[in-house]
Regions:
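Short, linear, compositionally biased motifs with a strong N-terminal bias
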Residues: 12-13
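Bacterial N-terminal signal peptides that target proteins for export
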Residues: 1-8
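N-terminal signal peptide c-region/cleavage motif recognized by signal peptidases
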Residues: 16-19
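Feature captures hydrophobic
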Residues: 22-173
Length: 173
């Protein structure tokens, strides 16, 4: 087989395998959309955040907002998730680009960490308490409310490891 025919065989095999699904960039709007779907498939998040009353602290807007970003990629949030009470579930109703400019610090959250730290938390190397205590996760929001929801909060951090996201580049924005 000549080099040219071997190259043709490889090209045909690659096409037959279908396009490679590119992972969204970690903490990008596309990643947040996938994280929203993963949230809705996690019973700890959808059920326990109703049981504790967390989801009801929405200041009358009908949803809570979470902004997330990778600190080594800039100092502003790159993705937004909105969580709302739908029936008897705390469901993610939006995952995408940051749209909510004004957050309410008594209801909403901003979380940031270096990329490597997000990856560690996503693997379950440590939970939210240790992450915050050692400054690995910066957190703005209702701290007492968060303290009462450490189990669900940990599941949110584990979504980072469950939702595919490339760390080779930073989210655009």
């Amino acid at each position: 087989m000549t080099f040219r025919s071997a190259l043709a065989v490889c090209a045909v095999a690659a096409c037959a395998a279908g396009p490679l699904a590119a992972q969204p960039v970690l903490m990008s709007p596309e990643w947040a959309q996938a994280a929203c779907t993963a949230w809705n498939n996690d019973a700890v998040l959808t059920d326990q955040l109703v049981e504790t009353g967390w989801v009801k602290n929405d200041k009358g807007r009908g949803f809570k907002v979470m902004h997330v970003f990778r600190k080594d990629c800039g100092a502003t949030p790159t993705a937004e998730m909105r969580i709302a009470l739908k029936g008897d579930k705390a469901l993610c109703v939006y995952g995408g680009k940051v749209e909510t400019a004004q957050l309410d610090r008594s209801a909403d959250y901003v979380m940031s960490a270096e990329t490597a730290r997000w990856v560690e938390m996503g693997r379950g190397d440590y939970g939210p308490m240790r992450a915050m205590m050692f400054g690995r996760l910066e957190f703005v929001g209702p701290k007492m409310e968060a303290m009462g929801n450490m189990g669900p909060f940990e599941n949110f951090l584990l979504l980072v490891g469950k939702v595919p996201g490339s760390t080779q580049s930073c989210p655009a924005g």
